């Protein structure tokens, strides 16, 4: 009977001592968006609630300013 050991998730923003998430930092934001364009939940990424709220706001601002797409490219 095999038991799987699940690795402890940690908050990347806490480890790097980030004060505020910037909507212009697209490389960071892209890491928290699925390939369909949805925001990945914190239970998957391990992000703390404070940073998850900042992340969602930053992604929504970047989408509004056309820095990030709302959805995927639909395979054209």
From Swiss-Prot:
Entry GO CC: cytosolic small ribosomal subunit
Q: Which UniProt keywords apply?
A: Ribonucleoprotein, Ribosomal protein, RNA-binding, rRNA-binding
Instruction: Write out the GO biological process terms.
Output: translation
Q: Matching Gene3D superfamilies, A to Z? A: Ribosomal protein S18
Q: Where are the transmembrane segments?
A: none
GO terms for MF: small ribosomal subunit rRNA binding; structural constituent of ribosome
| Signal peptide (residue range) | none
Q: Which Pfam families match?
A: Ribosomal_S18
PROSITE patterns registered for this protein in UniProt: RIBOSOMAL_S18
Q: How does it assemble?
A: Part of the 30S ribosomal subunit. Forms a tight heterodimer with protein bS6.
**Function recorded in the entry:** Binds as a heterodimer with protein bS6 to the central domain of the 16S rRNA, where it helps stabilize the platform of the 30S subunit.
Q: Report the PANTHER family cross-referenced here.
A: 30S RIBOSOMAL PROTEIN S18, SMALL RIBOSOMAL SUBUNIT PROTEIN BS18M
The entry assigns this protein to a family as follows: Belongs to the bacterial ribosomal protein bS18 family.
- Name of the protein in its database record: Small ribosomal subunit protein bS18
Name the gene: rpsR
